[in-house]
Amino acid sequence: MNLINEKLNNLENNATKSPKEAVILLNMGGPNSLYEVGVFLKNMFDDPFILTIKNNFMRKMVGKMIVNSRIEKSKKIYEKLGGKSPLTPITFALTERLNKLDPSRFYTYAMRYTPPYASMVLQDLALKEVESLVFFSMYPQYSSTTTLSSFNDAFNALKALETFRPKVRVIERFYASKKLNEIILNTILSTLNNRKSQDFVLIFSVHGLPKSVIDAGDTYQQECEHHVNLLKELVQQKNISFKEVLLSYQSKLGPMKWLEPSTEELIEKHRKSHIIIYPLAFTIDNSETLYELDMQYRLMAERLAVKEYLVCPCLNDSIEFAKFIIELVNNLKSE
């Protein structure tokens, strides 16, 4: 009987100690299997922040055509990555690390286009009787196509839970943080692995957007350019020199005018140099970093006889990035 009482007391104590604040890392998601490739593409191209066609019927029709034209190619890409996107398991590993480093909060994640969706995660947090939330965008720079889309989805999911009304705060961008940029620079230097930085053209490659999105008022291009300028300043402060430091845009889709220069253009332009690429718009590795940058563009670099071609990893579940996230949330609490 004493053993039973002891276990009941432990359960009560654990319930009392359960964190009352949760931090939800928001990202785009990625297929967790080849079966989910279709789900991922369908949800992405049905997103009005991605495919900005106001008429729902027309958007679904156009989205369906895009999905049908891309699904087999996308499946082949994910086959090369082991049959799934690395984004979800890496994000899970990051939350595991965060929960160990900061047990005062509960860290979890929600994806925009694949499970776990925000609605699923928020239902779980409601059962946990969480009192406050932080919606944490995993995109360093703000864009309506990423940050706003994720926040809109999360707030709509929260609104649907009529009896769950926690206090909500948001972290919508963090590219200007010197701490973040020091972590990025250290990642670049680690990838160089004692090679001479002055021999390398450093290309900060970010996900591209149609020019029309920027013309409509999206601040993404401005923030990416500002981010690169901050990193240039940091490089100078640390007395590190590169042959050149450049910004480029990848992943162009369709015939529309997109942001320039493209990453492919810069690789070709600097084919007689050593090149190192850092994926500046992503914090977690995904198909655009591991396939597009590290496989597809690497083959291009080899074909062009680029002297050396290096691709840096994203911040992923590194302890440095985890500590940075905790610091951002702590600073948010004191504001």
Swiss-Prot record:
The UniProt keyword set, sorted, is: Cytoplasm, Heme biosynthesis, Iron, Lyase, Metal-binding, Porphyrin biosynthesis
Q: Which pathway is this protein assigned to?
A: Porphyrin-containing compound metabolism; protoheme biosynthesis; protoheme from protoporphyrin-IX: step 1/1
- Annotated catalysed reactions: heme b + 2 H(+) = protoporphyrin IX + Fe(2+)
Q: Which Gene3D superfamilies match?
A: 3.40.50.1400
Give GO terms: molecular function aspect only. Answer: ferrochelatase activity; metal ion binding
Spell out the protein name for this chain.
Ferrochelatase
Function as written in the Swiss-Prot or TrEMBL entry: Catalyzes the ferrous insertion into protoporphyrin IX.
Coiled coil where? none
GO cellular component terms attached to this protein's record: cytoplasm
Biological process (GO) annotations held by this record are:
heme biosynthetic process
**UniProt entry tagged with the keyword Membrane:** no
Task: Tell me its family.
Answer: Belongs to the ferrochelatase family.
Give the UniProt subcellular location, in the record's own words: Cytoplasm
Q: Which NCBIfam families match?
A: hemH
The enzyme's E.C. designation: 4.98.1.1
What EC class does the entry list? lyase
Quote the record's binding site residues for Fe cation.
Answer: 207, 288
Please report a single Pfam family linked to this protein: Ferrochelatase
